[in-house]
Amino acid sequence: MNNRYPVMKKGLIVLVVIAVAAGGYYWWKHPAQPSSDGDLSGQSAHGKRGNGAHKPLAPVQAASAVTESVPQYLNGLGTVTAANTVTVRSRVDGNLMSIHFTEGQQVKAGQLLAEIDPRPYQVALMQAQGQLARDQATLANARRDLARYQKLAKTSLVSQQDLDTQNALVSETLGTIKADEGSVASAQLNLTYSRITSPIDGRVGLKQVDIGNYITSGDTNGLVVITQTHPVDVVFSVAENNISQIMQAQKSGEPLLVEAWDRSNQHLITRGKLLSLDNQIDATTGTIKIKARFDNQDDLLFPNQFVNARLKVNTLQDAVVIPAAALQMGNEGHFVWVINNEDKVSKKSVTAGLQDSQKVVISAGLNAGDRVVTDGLDRLTEGAKVEVVAAQSRATKETRASLPSKGESE
């Protein structure tokens, strides 16, 4: 008997240790919950509401497909060039006496720009005029002698040889006078050239020579450069495949519209008209150069400025148009999410035509009036019901949709 008690005591201790370990493990896996009846009932009700609640509908923005007249453009990167550019040079040599323009000023054709010292050319003109007057007097005297010789020849007092010699002298003097008249005209022209005038209407650039310098007609830099910017041209290139479209559009007889957009292609600068096409294709790039002319009275275009040119070659009538944001690309091509009368969405394949950053023409797959999703596309599934919201309220709707519903575990 005495030996049984120690064995039973050891077994009892082992059982107690196992029970304590099991209880600790259970307590660790299942923390204590509020034991009040009110709390238990509240928790139960809260859980029921959470399990039965519906998630909010996905907020989206939508737009209806519409029919519009859509212009078709050919795009190209262009450079603004002056309609005419002239380097004003002196035609005679001399000291620059005065300048009559301000850098950057608009000038008219014939307007005085600068003056060269005219005195050497005034002297040359006087010399030429004096020589002409002397030879004219010689001619008058030769003609009088010829008249006398002709009278005397009738009475045989003058030989025929003397008469012929006098005739030759008159003719020679006439030739000398012609040369003198040319010298006078040349001197007058040189004197005129001492006043440098603008050959065209345009804007003057920076002066290349200061007053007091001796300038020559062979100076390559010239006095100033004038660019004609009213009108102004834009030269750009399009692919050779587009030549037939341009030629076809020109058959209408109406000048083709050309738009000049800024470097970012976001803002329209001005509109002009097609002026001409080059007569050959650039074999290196496979493009052809096009020149458009712009009135530019507001000076929005400046020589050597880069612009994006758009040449209008056609207009699509009654085209189905949707916002560009609605068009998506998948493995099977372009598609849109269409919203039906029950506000449920479905994916629909479409054929896209002309498009820009704002709109896209749908050639097939949509009808005018169909509603398409333009924003909130990332969380759509086939047949899902959505809530169409205005642009300003979509952010609020998305915030609410991302929060857990009442009753959902956090």
Swiss-Prot record:
Main location: membrane
One Gene Ontology MF term: efflux transmembrane transporter activity
Membrane topology designation: Peripheral membrane protein
One Pfam family it belongs to: HlyD_D23
Compartment(s): Cell inner membrane
Gene3D superfamilies, A to Z: 2.40.30.170, 2.40.420.20, 2.40.50.100, Helix hairpin bin (1.10.287.470)
Chain residue ranges for the region called Disordered: 36-56
Range of residues in the leader sequence: 1-21
Highest rank taxon of the organism: Bacteria
Any one GO CC term of the record: plasma membrane
Keyword vocabulary terms for this entry: Cell inner membrane, Cell membrane, Membrane, Signal, Transport
Family: Belongs to the membrane fusion protein (MFP) (TC 8.A.1) family.
Family matches, as HAMAP family: MdtA
NCBIfam families assigned to the protein according to its UniProt record, in alphabetical order: PRK11556.1, RND_mfp
Subunit and partners: Part of a tripartite efflux system composed of MdtA, MdtB and MdtC.
Protein name (record): Multidrug resistance protein MdtA
Upper lineage: Bacteria, Pseudomonadati, Pseudomonadota, Gammaproteobacteria, Enterobacterales
